Amino acid sequence: MYAGLVFAGGGNRCYWQGGFYETVAPRLDLKPKRVVGASAGALAMLYTALGLGHYVRERVCEACLGRSSEMDWAGFRQGGRLFPVGDMYHLMLTDLFTRERLATLQAQADFRVAISRPPRFWPLPVAALLGIGAYQLEKRLRKPVHATAGRRLGFKPDLIRLENCAAPDDLIAALMASASVPPFMPAGLVGQRAALDGGLVDNAPAWALADMEAAGEPTLVLLTRPVSAVPQIANRTYVSPSQVIPVSQFTIRNPEGIRFAYELGIRDGEAFLRSLEAKARAV
């Protein structure tokens, strides 16, 4: 039914996408040709395609147990990262993406991971600070579905195609870069060039499906925040959570919020299916 899918970024809110996709995909027999994801949405698009949603959620929720802080001061004093979420994310990616699973994904669809390239000759710490600051400010003031501040600053969009990943390490580097939000997540390096969170250019990179839409092929964009209005673009459908998801993007101590996001995705997926059935009956 949909030839292209977009998984927007959103950190832990992206577990909503897992619940929605797992509910809707079997009923609609979704077999998209191209799937694009940014930040944690890029991970969500891949583990849902592999049918590993339950495993990922349980592993993450288990890792949250017993944690009272987002920071690891003891590890930091010994030379580790202050925010352990980045190392935890990398460890999970290394466990998930074997050579066999990469081959499975490459044979299934044209998956693309969105990253942002900072302006050339900018020191990376400056680029990260300005890019993330501009993104957050625009989000708070304008609440756009598609951000524009990053492009105006000179950030460039880039896509890493899974078919060009020769080994799991290439995919893991792309996923880490797509979620790169210092100091929470480390800066990325892809193709010997610096890379930051794909959401700094556009958190919902539907631009990567524009050629399909222009050719008359329908696409579906999975957002991770409730929105009151979306752009009206031919052949594009947006879906979003029906309420605010009570979990912060990078938290590693809120398993209840992660489960809530997933369960809300299931409910919203069922509501979406009912709306499609109602439209079909009205025709």
What are these regions (language model features)?
Residues M1-A38, L46-V283:
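Patatin-like phospholipase
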